[in-house]
């Protein structure tokens, strides 16, 4: 056999190779579509989809604790520190007493009353974070806008004047 002699063409091997490549490409495409659906169908680059997914999860956990009136646990989610009670002085900018005034069902500052249900209506990028519009107690308008910071996994109120448009 010389250097210029080509090996015999193996049709079965070529067919297996093509089936493998097309199957792999199809599987990766299906995986990408499922990831996009689970992340909430964000209109953003794929490398940001996990931020939407984690932001929705954190907001759902936070509001579930508020619905159960477990404000201590909800505050831990808000500041992303489960053991916040061991060092409360570290969170002097937004202390637990002020958090209770904002989120308690009997608080005069809580314009939604006792929070019983919630639904994330929309999520979008804002700066480095994810802005989430949440409809409280079955409302169709006047959503609660929360910002999720993917760097430190904490929640915050949306900046003044910044809210997601839910339509007419």
Predicted regions and their residues:
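Compositionally biased, intrinsically disordered/low-complexity regions enriched for serine, proline
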Residues: 4, 39, 105, 156-157
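Short, low-complexity N-terminal intrinsically disordered segments enriched in polar/charged residues
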Residues: 5-68
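Hydrophobic, Leu/Ile/Phe/Ala-enriched alpha-helical segments that form helix-helix packing faces
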Residues: 66, 103, 107, 152-156
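Short solvent-exposed beta->alpha transition segments
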Residues: 57, 61, 72-137
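Intrinsic disorder/low-complexity detector
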Residues: 71-72, 151
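Short beta-strand edge/turn micro-motifs at domain boundaries
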Residues: 8-14, 18-21, 135-168
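Amphipathic repeat-derived elements
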Residues: 31-52, 117-118, 123-126, 148-150, ...
């Amino acid at each position: 056999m010389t250097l210029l002699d080509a090996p015999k063409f193996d049709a079965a091997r070529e067919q297996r190779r093509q089936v493998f490549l097309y199957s792999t490409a199809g599987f990766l495409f299906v995986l990408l579509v499922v990831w996009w659906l689970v992340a909430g169908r964000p209109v953003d680059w794929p490398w940001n989809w996990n931020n939407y997914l984690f932001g929705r999860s954190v907001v759902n956990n936070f509001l579930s604790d508020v619905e159960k009136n477990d404000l201590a646990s909800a505050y831990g989610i808000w500041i992303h520190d489960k053991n916040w009670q061991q060092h409360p002085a570290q969170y002097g900018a937004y202390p637990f007493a002020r958090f209770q005034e904002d989120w308690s069902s009997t608080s005069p500052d809580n314009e939604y009353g006792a929070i019983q249900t919630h639904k994330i209506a929309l999520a979008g990028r804002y700066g480095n974070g994810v802005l989430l519009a949440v409809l409280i107690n079955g409302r169709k308008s006047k959503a609660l806008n929360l910002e999720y910071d993917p760097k430190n996994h904490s929640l915050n109120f949306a900046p003044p004047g910044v809210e997601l448009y839910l339509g007419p």
